[in-house]
């Protein structure tokens, strides 16, 4: 007589991996405020062009070069006056940095949620398309640099999401299998698609969505990072 035994395999959430900008940090609010301050400061310092025209050119440069482009004001000045005026440039840089530091904050409940997850024995990671220097500066400035077991930036993987490379790299750093980890991010086409491609569970951070995403394809949708605690408890329920 043959006896068939059905074994049910329960995967548990052992790690939570976060995108950085617009998931842990309200990046776009900070960026917009800093660029606005820099634009006004450069006008006050002698850049005699309309605010809207200058701001439009800054946005165009970021769209072409990437949001982390560090020479944006240099390129802006070359465009408008054909040279680098260091009085104007320094005014823009100082205003940008001052506003950035004032506005660089986590979303509500980020730190308490991370602490709760740590106390639950959950490993924490970050996968970001930002350069290492910029990612670590942001994490350190808001006091999150010591809370993660692994961090992967563009400089680590040399590939941007949704490539599977950065996701596999963070899984290796955390020492967990894909099915035992959940990815949290605001950009469905990058965070959700990339994580699902390697077998991770996913949570769409609707609170940080800047694209008015209608269909995200994630396993969960969250309006606050605090919801992750109950999601992990649910996934790990026997």
Can you say where each PLM-predicted feature lies in the sequence?
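N-terminal helical cap/lid subdomain that shapes the substrate entry/recognition surface
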Residues: 11-112, 133
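Asp-based, Mg2+/Mn2+-dependent phosphohydrolase catalytic module
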Residues: 3-16, 28-29, 79, 111, ...
């Amino acid at each position: 007589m043959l006896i068939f035994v059905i074994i049910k395999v329960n995967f548990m959430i052992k790690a939570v991996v976060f995108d950085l900008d617009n998931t842990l940090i309200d990046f776009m609010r900070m960026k917009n405020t800093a660029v606005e301050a820099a634009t006004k400061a450069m006008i006050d310092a002698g850049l005699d062009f309309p605010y809207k025209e200058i701001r439009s050119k800054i946005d165009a440069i970021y769209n072409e070069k990437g949001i982390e482009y560090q020479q944006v004001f240099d390129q802006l000045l070359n465009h408008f006056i054909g040279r680098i005026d260091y009085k104007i440039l320094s005014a823009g840089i100082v205003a940008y940095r001052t506003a950035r530091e004032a506005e660089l904050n986590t979303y509500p409940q980020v730190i308490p949620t991370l602490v709760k997850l740590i106390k639950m024995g959950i490993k924490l990671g970050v996968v970001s398309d930002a350069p290492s220097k910029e990612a670590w500066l942001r994490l350190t400035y808001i006091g999150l640099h010591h809370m993660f077991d692994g961090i992967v930036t563009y400089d680590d993987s040399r590939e941007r999401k949704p490539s599977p490379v950065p996701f596999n790299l963070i899984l290796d750093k955390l020492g967990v299998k894909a099915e035992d980890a959940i990815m949290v991010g605001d950009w469905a086409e990058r965070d959700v698609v990339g994580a699902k491609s390697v077998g991770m569970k996913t949570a769409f951070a609707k609170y940080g969505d800047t694209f008015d995403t209608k269909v995200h394809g994630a396993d969960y949708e969250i309006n606050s990072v605090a919801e992750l605690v109950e999601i992990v408890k649910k996934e790990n329920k026997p």
